[in-house]
C-alpha cells in the first residue's frame, strides 16, 4: 500500500529537501473560513496538512490550540463536518496529504469502523491520535492500517530506546517527534538536541521523522528541517489566525492571508534548509 504520504516523502527525497507540515484546527474560526485557509496552504508551500479535530478536553494542546478548538466547537464543528471539509478540499486538491489529528473519544463515539470508512472516502491519508498508546493498537491503529490509512505515532524526548520499538511497531507514514516535553506552543525547539534525537529514532526505523512543537519562525523551521525529514508548525499558524480575528473572534478580510503569508515564509525557511546543508 502506497499512500499519498509515502508518495510525498519519496518526491521530497528526490528533491533533497524536508517536508513543511502545517497544523490548523478544523473549523477555526468557522467552517467556511477554515476550508478557505486549508485550500490556500498547498500554494503557500505546505507539503502535508494536519487538521485538528476539535475536542472538549484536549490535554496535549497549549492555550492557542485549545482556544482554536473552542472557536471551532462554538461554530458548530463536528467530526462529520471535519470529514466534509476534507471532502470539499479534495475536490480541487488530489496530491497534498491530509492527516487528522485529535483524540480517541470523538472517534469512538462516531464509531471506529464508520469513521475509518468515511475518513478514507473523504480523502484523509493518516491519523494522529495522541491519547492511544501502542498497547491499544487493536482499537484503532490496526483497523486504520487495514482501511488504507497511515497511523502516525508521537515520540518524545522521554521515549527511551526500550520504549521506541513498541511506539514504532505499527507506525506508518512518518514518525512525529515532539521536540519538547509539555504542551504545544510552550517553548522553542533546540535544533542541535533535535538532530541527536532524530538520529536515535532512525536507528529503529526507516520511516521519515518529522519534528514539531516550538517552531515559530522561518529560521527555526530551517534549523529543524536541516536535521530531520520535516518541520511541523501549528501554534504559530494558529496565533496568526487568532490575531486576524475581530473583537468577537470572527474572521475578517485579513484572516486567510494572515495564515497563508506566514505559511509561505515558513515554507521558504524549510526549502532553504537542504540548500544550506549541501
From Swiss-Prot:
The active site lies at 50 (proton acceptor), 61 (proton acceptor)
| Keyword set includes Lyase | yes
- Pathway participation: Amino-acid biosynthesis; L-tryptophan biosynthesis; L-tryptophan from chorismate: step 5/5
Gene3D superfamilies on file = Aldolase class I
Q: Does the keyword Plastid apply?
A: no
Give the molecular function GO annotations.
Answer: tryptophan synthase activity
Catalytic activity, per the record?
A: (1S,2R)-1-C-(indol-3-yl)glycerol 3-phosphate + L-serine = D-glyceraldehyde 3-phosphate + L-tryptophan + H2O
Recorded E.C. number(s)? 4.2.1.20
* Keyword entries, A-Z: Amino-acid biosynthesis, Aromatic amino acid biosynthesis, Lyase, Tryptophan biosynthesis
Q: Which CDD domains match?
A: Tryptophan_synthase_alpha (cd04724)
Which GO CC terms are listed, alphabetically? cytosol
Annotated InterPro entries: Aldolase_TIM (IPR013785), RibuloseP-bd_barrel (IPR011060), Trp_synthase_alpha_AS (IPR018204), Trp_synthase_suA (IPR002028)
Q: Which domain of life is it from?
A: Bacteria
What is said about its interaction partners and assembly? Answer: Tetramer of two alpha and two beta chains.
Record's family?
A: Belongs to the TrpA family.
Protein task: The alpha subunit is responsible for the aldol cleavage of indoleglycerol phosphate to indole and glyceraldehyde 3-phosphate.
Could you tell me what this protein is called? Answer: Tryptophan synthase alpha chain
**Gene (name only):** trpA
